[in-house]
């Protein structure tokens, strides 16, 4: 019976040896704090709290920056996929190298339709100038091009006159007009070659150039080298085949002509 009270005294003493939970936790925390203080560090002692707060602040800043970049990238992604100007806009590649700007030719730039308009207008002007035409506007406002014949100049000489002249056959339509022009060209020159002392220095009309009844007769040389009287063939045939003209004395016709003497022989008879 005496053993029971002894056991009762030993039990509470063993329980007192186990520290209470709160005191043990506080003591453990104090021990860890003391161990941290005793640790060897590169920084000065007592700067742990400041370093911890700085790291915490830096971490919060990094989180905020990441959040902002994610929000911006999300908005950009939505804008690129849902904006109506997605097809027209193009983002240049970062790896592309900028080339040096070359010399600017033809500034300011001309649009394509203006270039086409200029080319068509220049081609029209070129065609009209090549035809030698004259542009006239009708009552309806339409342009009409009147074709102008190019000048067909033929050299003409006269016996007794050292100076030759040129006539444009396309400016005349008949042999009569041609004979009138020849008389006008050589009348003064022929009078200048005559002897003034004999009283023959006055200008006299040159008649009978086509029918051989005058002092002089008009002849021509064709492309084949034949010498013939002017007026033997139709006017258009004469214009297309004549090479040069010459006014000769009527007395020398038989020896000067190489073809077409039948008309002169008829006139002589």
Curated annotation (Swiss-Prot):
Instruction: Kindly list the biological process annotations in GO that this record carries.
Output: auxin-activated signaling pathway; response to auxin
Q: What is the induction note for this entry?
A: By auxin.
Motif annotated as EAR-like (transcriptional repression), chain positions: 38-42
PB1 domain residues = 151-250
Q: Compositional bias of type Basic and acidic residues: which residue ranges? A: 25-40, 137-146
| A GO term, aspect molecular function | identical protein binding
Major subcellular site:
nucleus
Q: Where is this region: Disordered?
A: 25-55, 76-146
Assembly information from the UniProt record: Homodimers and heterodimers. Interacts with phytochrome A. Interacts with TPL.
PANTHER family hit by this protein: AUXIN-RESPONSIVE PROTEIN IAA17 (PTHR31734), AUXIN-RESPONSIVE PROTEIN IAA26 (PTHR31734:SF2)
Q: Which family does it belong to?
A: Belongs to the Aux/IAA family.
Q: What is known of its domains?
A: The N-terminal half of the protein contains two conserved domains I and II. Domain I includes a slightly degenerated ERF-associated amphiphilic repression (EAR) motif which seems to be involved in the activity of transcriptional repression. Domain II is required for the correct degradation of the protein through the SCF-mediated ubiquitin-proteasome pathway. Interactions between Aux/IAA proteins and auxin response factors (ARFs) occur through their C-terminal dimerization domains III and IV.
Question: What is the name attached to this protein's record?
Answer: Auxin-responsive protein IAA26
Organismal lineage: Eukaryota, Viridiplantae, Streptophyta, Embryophyta, Tracheophyta
Name the encoding gene, please.
IAA26
């Amino acid at each position: 019976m005496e053993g029971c009270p002894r056991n009762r005294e030993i039990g509470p003493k063993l329980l007192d040896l186990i520290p209470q939970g709160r005191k043990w936790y506080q003591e453990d925390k104090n021990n860890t704090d003391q161990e941290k203080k005793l640790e060897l560090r590169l920084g000065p002692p007592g700067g742990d709290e400041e370093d911890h707060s700085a790291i915490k602040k830096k971490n919060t800043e990094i989180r905020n920056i990441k959040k902002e970049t994610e929000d911006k990238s999300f908005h950009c992604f939505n804008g690129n996929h849902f904006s109506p100007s997605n097809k027209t806009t193009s983002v240049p590649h970062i790896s592309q190298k900028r080339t040096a700007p070359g010399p600017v030719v033809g500034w300011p730039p001309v649009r394509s339709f203006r270039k086409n308009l200029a080319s068509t207008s220049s081609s029209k002007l070129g065609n009209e100038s090549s035809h030698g035409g004259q542009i006239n506007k009708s009552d309806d406002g339409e342009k009409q091009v009147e074709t102008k014949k190019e000048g067909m100049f033929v050299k003409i000489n006269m016996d007794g006159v050292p100076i030759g002249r040129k006539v444009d056959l396309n400016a005349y339509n008949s042999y009569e007009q041609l004979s009138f022009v020849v008389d006008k060209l050589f009348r003064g020159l022929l009078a200048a070659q005559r002897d003034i002392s004999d009283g023959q220095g006055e200008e006299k009309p040159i008649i009978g150039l086509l029918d051989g009844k005058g002092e002089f007769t008009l002849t021509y040389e064709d492309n084949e080298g034949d010498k013939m009287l002017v007026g033997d063939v139709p006017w258009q045939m004469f214009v297309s085949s004549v090479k040069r003209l010459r006014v000769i004395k009527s007395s020398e016709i038989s020896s000067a002509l190489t073809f077409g003497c039948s008309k002169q022989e008829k006139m002589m008879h």
